[in-house]
A protein has these predicted regions:
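Intrinsically disordered, low-complexity terminal regions
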Residues: 1-40, 110, 127-129, 134-135, ...
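Short Fe-S-cluster ligation motifs
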Residues: 88
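Leucine-rich repeat
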Residues: 57, 76-77, 95, 100, ...
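Feature marks extracellular polysaccharide-active and adherence modules
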Residues: 32-34, 53-55, 62-63, 72-74, ...
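Beta-strand repeat architectures
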Residues: 19-28, 39-48, 59-67, 78-85, ...
Length: 227
């Protein structure tokens, strides 16, 4: 089913997707003329396939559950924020805070992601085929972040148990973030994520893993300058 945002209001489109017609049971949608609208496809809770033809604004696919969403363009701040499950695939670049606070699902970004990618992530898997900006992975708690390019300043600042895999250069590490060894389980998981993102030209062994040194979990006066 085609949903044209030049003919329909954003509220009408989101309401239709949030309340699927059980009799018609159409679960394949194409959204045209998004023209930078904010909160497109926010709050979806059921299995469906959506293709957004164009650029979108803030919080696209926020709070997503189960839906498979492809964006043929760039996205603004907070794509897939607080996502619970499903898959969001950005064919272009992403602005700041991509995948922020998300608990699950898979976010794929074909281009670059700006600052704070994966901030406070809580279980989502994020794959960025380009590079990420500063403070990416800040206070991230669990899940995996894969970056095929470079990472900006303060990567993984104050993170908990997220695994961050970087293939390129890291400008600097944030507080309590250190390079860690890759074991067989990490390599297996990373190869799986690369496969899911249809990345065939890189192998897991070409990445470095970063994680928490676990020195800031509890307050220690010796570490006060790092808090």
């Amino acid at each position: 089913m085609k949903l044209d945002l030049k003919k329909l209001k954003l509220r009408e489109v989101n309401e239709k997707l949030q309340n699927l017609d059980r009799k018609q049971n159409d679960r394949n949608f194409t959204i045209t003329n998004p023209e930078g609208n904010h909160a497109v496809c926010a709050g979806l809770t059921e299995e469906m396939n959506i293709n957004i033809k164009g650029h979108v604004g803030y919080y696209c696919a926020g709070m997503n559950q189960k839906a498979q969403i492809i964006i043929d363009g760039n996205v603004g701040t907070g794509v897939a924020e607080n996502m619970m499950s499903g898959k969001v695939h950005v064919k272009g670049n992403a602005s700041q805070s991509a995948g922020a606070t998300a608990h699950g699902g898979l976010l794929i970004i074909d281009g670059n992601a700006s600052s704070r990618c994966g901030i406070s992530m809580k279980g989502i898997d994020i794959v960025v085929k380009g590079s990420v900006g500063h403070m990416s992975g800040f206070m991230s708690q669990s899940g995996n972040m894969v970056v095929c390019g470079d990472a900006g300043e303060a990567l993984g600042d104050s993170l908990y148990e997220t695994n961050i895999y970087i293939r390129g250069k890291v400008k600097s590490l944030g507080a309590d973030c250190v390079e860690k060894k890759m074991d067989k389980n990490h390599i297996k998981k990373l190869n799986l994520l690369l496969k899911e993102a249809n990345i065939k030209n890189y192998k897991a062994e070409s990445f470095k893993r970063y994680g928490s040194a676990r020195k800031l979990y509890n307050f220690k006066i010796d570490n006060v300058s790092s808090y």
